[in-house]
């Protein structure tokens, strides 16, 4: 049954590796409770997924997009471009922006102002790593 189904799917998704990815993703969705769009006929989830792709009840493009979204760990959000009027205002007041940056500098560089004694005390406080047989 599955061999005939795969041959029917090759017409819809030309790359067989992509077909495997799409069908396995759809089979996982079915096992998680997604509604199926064809009769089950006592078939397992991968065969049902292949039959759905072969019968074109699901779009391969939609499945591919859903697969990509399920694999993404960080989703980029399109931020609106800055308004040209606000850019003109920031260019008109560069002295104010420089003054604000100078005020922030001492707070950001406090970690660079350690004395030599503090650095030596920190180095002496480090614990050497334990030797292991890995190397």
Curated annotation (Swiss-Prot):
<keyword id="KW-0808">Transferase</keyword>
<keyword id="KW-0240">DNA-directed RNA polymerase</keyword>
<dbReference type="InterPro" id="IPR036161">
    <property type="entry name" value="RPB6/omega-like_sf"/>
</dbReference>
<comment type="subunit">
    <text>The RNAP catalytic core consists of 2 alpha, 1 beta, 1 beta' and 1 omega subunit. When a sigma factor is associated with the core the holoenzyme is formed, which can initiate transcription.</text>
</comment>
<dbReference type="GO" id="GO:0000428">
    <property type="term" value="C:DNA-directed RNA polymerase complex"/>
</dbReference>
<comment type="similarity">
    <text>Belongs to the RNA polymerase subunit omega family.</text>
</comment>
<comment type="function">
    <text>Promotes RNA polymerase assembly. Latches the N- and C-terminal regions of the beta' subunit thereby facilitating its interaction with the beta and alpha subunits.</text>
</comment>
<dbReference type="InterPro" id="IPR006110">
    <property type="entry name" value="Pol_omega/Rpo6/RPB6"/>
</dbReference>
<protein>
    <recommendedName>
        <fullName>DNA-directed RNA polymerase subunit omega</fullName>
        <ecNumber>2.7.7.6</ecNumber>
    </recommendedName>
</protein>
<dbReference type="GO" id="GO:0003899">
    <property type="term" value="F:DNA-directed RNA polymerase activity"/>
</dbReference>
<keyword id="KW-0804">Transcription</keyword>
<dbReference type="Pfam" id="PF01192">
    <property type="entry name" value="RNA_pol_Rpb6"/>
</dbReference>
<dbReference type="GO" id="GO:0006351">
    <property type="term" value="P:DNA-templated transcription"/>
</dbReference>
<keyword id="KW-0548">Nucleotidyltransferase</keyword>
<dbReference type="InterPro" id="IPR003716">
    <property type="entry name" value="DNA-dir_RNA_pol_omega"/>
</dbReference>
<dbReference type="GO" id="GO:0003677">
    <property type="term" value="F:DNA binding"/>
</dbReference>
């Amino acid at each position: 049954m599955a061999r005939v189904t795969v041959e029917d799917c090759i017409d819809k998704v030309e790359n067989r590796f992509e077909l495997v990815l799409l069908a396995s993703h759809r089979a996982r969705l079915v096992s998680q409770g997604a509604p199926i769009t064809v009769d089950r006929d006592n078939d397992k989830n991968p065969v049902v997924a292949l039959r759905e792709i072969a019968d074109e009840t699901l779009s391969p493009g939609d499945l591919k997009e859903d697969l990509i979204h399920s694999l993404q760990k960080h989703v980029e959000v399109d931020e609106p471009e800055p308004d040209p009027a606000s850019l003109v205002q920031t260019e008109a007041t560069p002295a104010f922006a420089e003054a604000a940056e100078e005020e922030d500098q001492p707070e950001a560089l406090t970690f660079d102002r350690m004395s030599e004694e503090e650095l030596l005390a920190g180095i002496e406080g480090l614990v050497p790593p334990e030797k292991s047989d890995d190397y």
